[in-house]
């Protein structure tokens, strides 16, 4: 399971906050390939084309951010694929703290992102 860097940005819970984050990244031509902005923590989780540049752009725009390691999987877009991946982590005693996923209509694969208790062990 590949481990990738995820940018986590703390934002105010008000209209325009996500737009400002995205604009700061767009101004530096940084592509957002994954997004989660759920939960009461007021944190936006992002997979981006250039994590280091994203961190600098966000700091310059006045945001607090940090990098986290997450597991990003490309799974077949069919029933049972996610269940098998989750079971594999469970067998290794790795807890899934959160997850988000996306697939394009008609796509053959889905991208699943898990924040896990031990990214290094999940990668093996």
Regions found by a protein language model. Give the residues of each.
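A conserved regulatory-domain signal marking ACT and ACT-like small-molecule sensing domains
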Residues: 1-124
